């Protein structure tokens, strides 16, 4: 659903509507990420011991994100909103390359490719929605566009199959992790900002 009909002038969507859409979208992205990870795991990672290697090597690890709801509760909502923006921006580049590289895989499974394309598209929509939310919650605040730079493209293009598959596995593992965090942060922010923490 487009937030404003095309050509609409001064279209104002309520903050509650924006949050509703953002929460639905982030939940959808997390579901797709989980499905894509599970599909990849089943098809390519069996018996390769990837999980034990994939600990704490996400490109967004440099952004200190709260690990659970209790930690997130301690963070001021302005900082949490900015953190969500940073994590979403940090995924623009890797998602673009993920789609390109999956397309180039031999017998690229449609179950993985179609989800990668959809996630890239929806991540952009969620980022736009979050920028609108920040604009309403803190009008006039110029948010600096800080994000974590991803440098994993060479590993997705390695000639060695094991190394390449592990790079894909790790990226999908991180995507699932981060999409889960964003989903939780947005639910928490919606509760705080829209319902004054009465939920």
UniProtKB/Swiss-Prot annotation:
PROSITE patterns, per database record: SOMATOTROPIN_1, SOMATOTROPIN_2
Keyword Ribosomal protein annotated: no
GO aspect biological process, one term: positive regulation of receptor signaling pathway via JAK-STAT
Entry GO CC: extracellular space
Subcellular locations according to the entry: Secreted
Domain of life: Eukaryota
GO MF annotation terms: hormone activity; prolactin receptor binding
Disulfide bonds: 4-11, 58-174, 191-199
Positions of glycan attachment: 31
Keywords: Disulfide bond, Glycoprotein, Hormone, Lactation, Phosphoprotein, Secreted
Record PTM Phosphoserine, positions in chain: 26, 34, 90
InterPro entries in the record: 4_helix_cytokine-like_core, Somatotropin/Prolactin, Somatotropin_CS
Cytoplasm in keyword set: no
Family: Belongs to the somatotropin/prolactin family.
Subunit relationships: Interacts with PRLR.
Free-text function comment from the UniProt entry: Prolactin acts primarily on the mammary gland by promoting lactation.
Name the record gives this protein: Prolactin
């Amino acid at each position: 659903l487009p937030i404003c009909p095309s050509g609409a002038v001064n279209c104002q969507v309520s903050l509650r509507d924006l949050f509703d859409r953002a929460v639905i979208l982030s939940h959808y992205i997390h579901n797709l990420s989980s499905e894509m990870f599970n599909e990849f795991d089943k098809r390519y990672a069996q018996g390769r011991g990837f999980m034990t290697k994939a600990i704490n090597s996400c490109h967004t690890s440099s952004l200190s994100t709260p690990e659970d709801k209790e930690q997130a509760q301690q963070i001021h909502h302005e900082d949490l909103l900015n953190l969500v923006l940073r994590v979403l921006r940090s995924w623009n580049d890797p998602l673009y390359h993920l789609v390109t590289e999956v397309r180039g895989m031999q017998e690229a499974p449609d179950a993985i490719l179609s989800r990668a394309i959809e996630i890239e598209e929806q991540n952009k929509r969620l980022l736009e929605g979050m920028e609108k939310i920040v604009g309403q919650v803190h009008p006039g605040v110029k948010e600096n566009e800080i994000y974590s730079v991803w440098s994993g493209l060479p590993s997705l293009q390695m000639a060695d199959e094991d190394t390449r598959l592990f790079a894909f596995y790790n990226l999908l593992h991180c995507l699932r992790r981060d999409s889960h965090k964003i989903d939780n942060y947005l639910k928490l922010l919606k509760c705080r900002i829209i319902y004054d923490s009465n939920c």
